[in-house]
A protein has these predicted regions:
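Terminal presequence/propeptide segments associated with secretion/organelle targeting
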Residues: 7-176
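N-terminal export leaders
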Residues: 1-3
Length: 176
C-alpha cells in the first residue's frame, strides 16, 4: 500500500520548469546553481550535450560507453519492420542479443551528436539588411547555405545546420 501511495504522489506532483526552455549554449548556469545548490559548469553541460543524440529527427541518448543508444519506440519501429522477416517479427516479438556481434544495424539511419554550436545571428541578420520580399529571402538563404558549407568544410562526416530561434531573433549553426 505504501508503494502505491508513493507512486500516486509522484503522479500528482507538478513539474516546474522555472528556468524556461534553454539550449546547451544558453543554459542559466548561475541561476540554477544558486536556486538548487548544484555545481553545474560548462564542462558538465558539454558532457550532457555529447550524450544527446539525434536519429532521423528523433531525440535519443547514449546510455553506455559502448555506444548503446536509447530512444522512443516510434523512432525505430520502421527499422524493426525492415529487419523483420516472415520467420522473425521484431515489431511483435522484440529482439535481444547476447553480445555485440549479434546486434542488427538499421539501414540508412545515422546517429548524430551535436559537437559544436556557434552563434551566427549577426551574420544572418546582416545578410538581409535593407532587402525585402524575394531578395530578402534569397540573401538569407544564400548566407545560411554559406555558413553551413564553411562550418562543415566539405567533410561528409558532419551535418551543419543553421537553426532559427525566437522567430528569427537568434540564429545558431549546429554541427552534428
Amino acid at each position: 500500500m505504501g508503494a502505491l501511495l508513493a507512486g500516486a504522489g509522484l503522479v500528482a506532483s507538478r513539474a516546474l520548469a522555472d528556468e524556461g526552455m534553454w539550449t546547451f549554449d544558453n543554459f542559466p548556469i548561475q541561476t540554477v546553481n544558486d536556486k538548487y545548490g548544484t555545481r553545474i559548469d560548462q564542462a558538465w553541460l558539454d558532457r550532457v550535450r555529447n550524450a544527446a543524440v539525434r536519429i532521423q529527427g528523433c531525440s535519443a541518448s547514449f546510455v553506455s560507453d559502448q555506444g548503446l543508444i536509447l530512444t522512443n519506440w516510434h523512432c525505430v519501429v520502421g527499422c524493426a519492420q525492415e529487419l523483420s522477416s516472415p520467420e522473425q517479427d521484431y515489431v511483435k516479438n522484440g529482439f535481444m542479443t547476447a553480445n555485440r556481434e549479434e546486434e542488427k544495424r538499421c539501414p540508412g539511419q545515422t546517429a548524430e551528436v551535436l559537437v559544436d554550436i556557434v552563434d551566427v545571428t549577426d551574420r544572418v541578420l546582416a545578410s538581409g539588411a535593407g532587402l525585402e520580399g524575394a531578395a530578402f529571402n534569397a540573401a538569407r538563404t544564400a548566407e545560411t547555405n554559406a555558413i553551413q558549407t564553411e562550418a562543415c568544410a566539405g567533410d561528409p562526416k558532419f551535418n551543419c545546420q543553421v537553426i532559427s530561434f525566437y522567430r528569427g531573433g537568434r540564429y545558431a549553426m549546429y554541427k552534428f
